[in-house]
Amino acid sequence: MQKIIHVDMDCFYAAVEMRDFPELRGKPIAVGGRSDRRGVISTCNYEARQFGVRSAMASGYALKLCPDLILVPGRMQVYKEVSNQIRAVFERYTDLIEPLSLDEAYLDVTESSHCKGSATLMAEAIRAEILAETGLTASAGIAPVKFLAKIASDLNKPNGQYVIRPEMIEEFVKTLPLIKIPGVGKVTAKKLADLGLHTCSDIQAYPEPKLVERFGKFGSVLIERSKGIDKRAILPNRERKSVGVETTLAKDIHTLEQCRAVMPQLIQELGARVSRSAKDRAINKQVVKLKFEDFKQTTIEHRSDEISVNLFYQLLEQAMERQHERGIRLLGVSVGLASNSIASEQADVDSSQMDLGF
């Protein structure tokens, strides 16, 4: 049985800014974006979230929701330095560390002898050391598998932790909303809802062949996750090369106008995914993908250092030149990510949740 800890810093970029500039504390702030440009917010503090401000939101819209919102320019080098401090804390407990971004990581502590082998106590100690050494709070989730540890880290935020023990998994996943499963965004969640699928128990009762037929490989993943299964191991120094979103259409479409109508939701979801899992990474290209009725596919890409909506539409037009009157069954957008230096730089707990066995 694995013991996985998912550590997620609380409002990381915003928290660093409030630590370094105390006059910002207690005020709604957001990092990134500018009021005079179509910028996008990287993250915001809890005061801003009370007004509905969220990551990946256009800064102009965020200011409409919260007129007193303070927009703070990002300081990526500072965030990387703090991230290295946090990484050093992780390394005291395990070498099996899978960074997801500057502010979150998976830790496999299965073989660690710290804290009498208790992942629960190790998570508590890690959070305490991060607070003492950086002045920042972290939340943590503890579970036997990765995706449940990630979900658990969000259940007692901020500055808390939650444990899903092996014997809790079956009951926990029954009522788990599918939108909570990593990889299920708004687009996929709507498709599932259209089939009457809202929770993991709904997936468990749904015919597996139909789910795989509708969602392909991800259908198989959903079946496993609905049962609390996640066979993925921790990948030390993992570095993803791209982030993408695609949708398999209910019916084939044939015109550029029909494709353009699908794009806004895909681009919005892509922006949200980049903000969640790759906000510290530089973008190096944009890609549009089409899969036709004969299951052949084509991709068009172009170099870009930021997400440009106009460029996505230009790439779509170029891809459509390869249609040759075939129906289109899938449409996708993605961005390539430049190599990161994170890996190379190296640079209150509920007592009822404590269990020395886990």
From Swiss-Prot:
Q: What GO cellular-component annotations does this UniProt entry give?
A: cytosol
Q: Which GO terms describe its biological process?
A: DNA-templated DNA replication; error-prone translesion synthesis; SOS response
The residues the record assigns to binding Mg(2+) are: 8, 103
Q: Where is this site: Substrate discrimination?
A: 13
What keywords sit in the KW lines? Cytoplasm, DNA damage, DNA repair, DNA replication, DNA-binding, DNA-directed DNA polymerase, Magnesium, Metal-binding, Mutator protein, Nucleotidyltransferase, Transferase
Cofactors (names):
Mg(2+)
* The keyword Ubl conjugation is annotated on this UniProt entry: no
| Cofactor note (record) | Binds 2 magnesium ions per subunit.
**Which GO terms fall under molecular function for this chain's record?**
damaged DNA binding; DNA-directed DNA polymerase activity; magnesium ion binding
Catalytic machinery residues: 104
Q: What class of enzyme is it?
A: transferase
Q: Which SUPFAM superfamilies match?
A: DNA/RNA polymerases, Lesion bypass DNA polymerase (Y-family), little finger domain
Catalytic activity, EC? 2.7.7.7
This protein's superkingdom? Bacteria
Q: Where in the cell is it found?
A: Cytoplasm
What HAMAP family does the entry give? DNApol_IV (MF_01113)
Provide the family line: Belongs to the DNA polymerase type-Y family.
Q: What does this protein do?
A: Poorly processive, error-prone DNA polymerase involved in untargeted mutagenesis. Copies undamaged DNA at stalled replication forks, which arise in vivo from mismatched or misaligned primer ends. These misaligned primers can be extended by PolIV. Exhibits no 3'-5' exonuclease (proofreading) activity. May be involved in translesional synthesis, in conjunction with the beta clamp from PolIII.
Q: How does it assemble?
A: Monomer.
Q: What is this protein called?
A: DNA polymerase IV
Q: Which organism is it from?
A: Shewanella halifaxensis (strain HAW-EB4)
- Lineage from the top down? Bacteria, Pseudomonadati, Pseudomonadota, Gammaproteobacteria, Alteromonadales
